[in-house]
Amino acid sequence: MEEQKFHSLVKALNEHEGIEEVFLLNKDGSIIYKSGEFSLTDDEAKSILSAWKEKEPSLSFQNFRFAILKNDDLQLAAKNIGKGKGNIVGSITREGDYLIAHTRDEALILLEWSIFINKVAWS
């Protein structure tokens, strides 16, 4: 995916309040683009994608655990339970990359975020 398209997807995601960070990973879990300066290492990105692909029960982001509630080949939906650290949602893109966002518990509920990121990723 070209950088300009990534930034247009980030803009579309920001239609709703609650988007914290957005990042794009390739099929190996390497970071292609990030929506801003935030802490995300290549190892952490690879771990998130591995949890998604391997259908693990949880993933870690910024040292917080997120329980994976929806996990299929196209979409990911995970929630931080008890610590108030929001959600991780993701969708595969037309190009085969993985668009992932960290959201707050505002505007949309977790499954709505999951559907929304999928809609944006395929636009």
From Swiss-Prot:
UniProt-annotated location(s): Cytoplasm, Cytoskeleton
UniProt organism field: Lokiarchaeum sp. (strain GC14_75)
Primary localisation category: cytoplasm
Gene Ontology CC entries for this record: cytoplasm; cytoskeleton
One Gene Ontology term of the molecular function aspect: actin binding
Function: Binds to actin and affects the structure of the cytoskeleton. At high concentrations inhibits spontaneous rabbit actin nucleation. This strongly suggests this archaea has a profilin-regulated actin system, and actin-type genes can be identified in this organism.
UniProt-listed SUPFAM superfamilies: Profilin (actin-binding protein) (SSF55770)
Protein name (Swiss-Prot/TrEMBL): Loki profilin-3
Entry keyword set: Actin-binding, Cytoplasm, Cytoskeleton
Keyword Nucleus appears in the UniProt entry: no
Family under the similarity heading: Belongs to the Asgard profilin family.
Other comment: It is not clear if Loki profilins 1, 2 and 3 are from the same strain.
Presence of the UniProt keyword Metal-binding in the record: no
Lineage: Archaea, Promethearchaeati, Promethearchaeota, Promethearchaeia, Promethearchaeales
